[in-house]
């Protein structure tokens, strides 16, 4: 039986929540739309993006995990900038986590949809590490 987008997001949320990646960040893991607006923590947001019922019992699609990192006042001059060191640490850990995802741990097969990178979120003085994954799901 095919899964819905929310069911897939729920599955990925559990994978992230129970990962070493979650223990690396100082915030929480949230499903899309549930992170507190004023959070200044390193929070991971899991979002289902697209899904296709390609061939029964196979589904495929894309999910994204964004890990927010608060900007820092690096020069003590009141100007907030990207915490390059921390973003790099999280990018490397995220890459290691993605490489550890194997089909023998679940019915999902993952591959990176694009290189893991950091993007600016200027309205909240934070940046986020973006992990975009393609998935294939076997539903028996």
Segments from the language model and where they lie:
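Short secondary-structure boundary/capping segments within folded domains
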Residues: 35-40, 53-57
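Charged, amphipathic alpha-helical segments and their flanking helix caps
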Residues: 1-26, 48-140
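Intrinsically disordered, low-complexity, compositionally biased regions/tails
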Residues: 9, 31-32, 37, 65
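N-terminal, polar/charged subdomain of small-to-medium soluble alpha/beta proteins
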Residues: 28-35, 41-43, 86
């Amino acid at each position: 039986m095919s899964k819905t987008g929310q069911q897939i997001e729920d599955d990925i949320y559990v994978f992230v929540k129970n990962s070493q990646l979650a223990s690396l960040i100082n915030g929480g893991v949230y499903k899309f739309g549930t992170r507190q607006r004023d959070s200044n923590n390193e929070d991971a947001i899991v979002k289902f993006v697209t899904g296709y019922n390609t061939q029964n019992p196979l589904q495929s699609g894309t999910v994204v995990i964004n890990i927010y990192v608060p900007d820092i006042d690096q020069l003590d001059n009141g100007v907030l900038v990207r915490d390059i060191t921390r973003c790099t640490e999280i990018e490397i850990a995220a890459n290691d986590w993605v490489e550890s995802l194997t089909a023998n741990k679940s019915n999902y097969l993952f591959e990176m949809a694009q290189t893991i990178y950091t993007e600016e979120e200027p309205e909240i003085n934070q940046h986020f590490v973006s992990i975009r994954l393609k998935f294939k799901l076997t539903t028996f």
